[in-house]
């Protein structure tokens, strides 16, 4: 950034809209004709050419091979260590997405209590399911100024091994409470025209026009059985064939030894995936 001058920015600004690809969502009391007129006005004002499909941004999700476990580590210019765990759950599927969401709801409190309250590993402790494009992941994140990333990894792996007890002790009433909580969250509508427009935009763009996406997911949550959720949790947390990636960031000046087999260059990681 230090090499960029104001003149560079001004020159680039003139070419910024030469070619564009626009995704939009219009929500409100406009007619189809008024909506099209608005779009035409925008395109006319920009004076742009269409951006070719092969030049448009597309988020590419790398797929980890079955049974593979990757560990990547690097020292950073920060006083904190961190562990970011990404467990590859599978391809987008309403049933699998519902199960992953339910599992996230069940483990959230226990993971936080064990990692932050009981073991006091760090201030930031998160667990959540995540969908990127057509892939579902389960994420575990800890930031710590007192424990190195490889120690964090040991603690998290021990916690994952203990999740069998967490799900075997889950009562029908607790399961139904988590289930109902998810349904209520999915059924909640935006409380402003902007929030509603944002939800509709996500359905139009991210879900490719599937405006019944939430209803389908709600039905998938309603169809869940405790045994099926527990089985999927076992595959996510305790099955050696489930692919996973650990990103272990070491604080500046860290003396923690990097174990053998840990990748320290992004290029090597990419090569192992291909």
Spans of features found by a protein language model:
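C-terminal regions of mature proteins
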Residues: 1-45, 50-65, 71-77, 86-90, ...
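Short, solvent-exposed loop/turn segments at the edges of secondary structure
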Residues: 17-19, 77-82, 98, 133-135
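Short, conserved charged micro-motifs
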Residues: 32-37, 93-97, 147-154, 257-258
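Short, solvent-exposed amphipathic alpha-helical segments in soluble enzyme
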Residues: 40-45, 102, 157-158
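A structural supersecondary motif
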Residues: 82-88, 104-144
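Active/ligand-binding-proximal structured segments within catalytic/core domains
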Residues: 95-107
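Long, C-terminal catalytic modules of enzymes
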Residues: 130-137, 149, 153, 164, ...
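Extended amphipathic alpha-helical segments enriched in small hydrophobics
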Residues: 140-172
